[in-house]
Amino acid sequence: MTIYQPRLTHIALHVEQLDECIQFYQSFCQLYVSHERASGNKRVVWLSERGREHDFVMVMMSGGHNLPPPEGDYRHLGFAVASKEEVDRLAEKAAEQGCLLWPPRQEPYPVGYYCGVLDPSGNQVEFSYGQPLGSGSPAA
């Protein structure tokens, strides 16, 4: 019998503004809807990176409530980007849309250069460059 190590395959978020969240993750993260279904009177949507549909998805479910994190809470979803300029571009876009949370900043390795953005349901999203994570990392 083969024993498999647990592997992270998805994160599920119950959100209040499903369509706005879909649009946000499509616009900021280039995710696309890889699956959608109704579940009773609620909708369930899987958002994926192209080519990773069977590796990792973000599941979004309608009918949730915005739950802003407590003051000083740093929980977030992290996305690696290709350059510091891309971090700056996303931060500028977020500022224009009124959802910039943390302006770009440089931290010592392994944190790198990053900014923070709020999605329409109040989830914190980090865009970073220079971390040893993701397909574009120096360690990959």
Where are the regions that the model predicts?
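Short beta-strand element of the conserved SAM-dependent methyltransferase core
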Residues: 45-49, 60, 79, 115-117
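Vicinal oxygen chelate
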Residues: 1-4, 7-16, 67-140
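Hydrophobic pocket/interface hotspot
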Residues: 21, 25, 87, 94
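Short beta-strand/turn micro-motifs at beta-sheet edges
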Residues: 1, 61-67
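Core segments of cupin and vicinal oxygen chelate
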Residues: 3, 12-55
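Conserved segment of winged-helix/HTH DNA-binding domains
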Residues: 54-62
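Generic structural signal for well-ordered beta-strand positions
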Residues: 34, 55-56, 102, 125
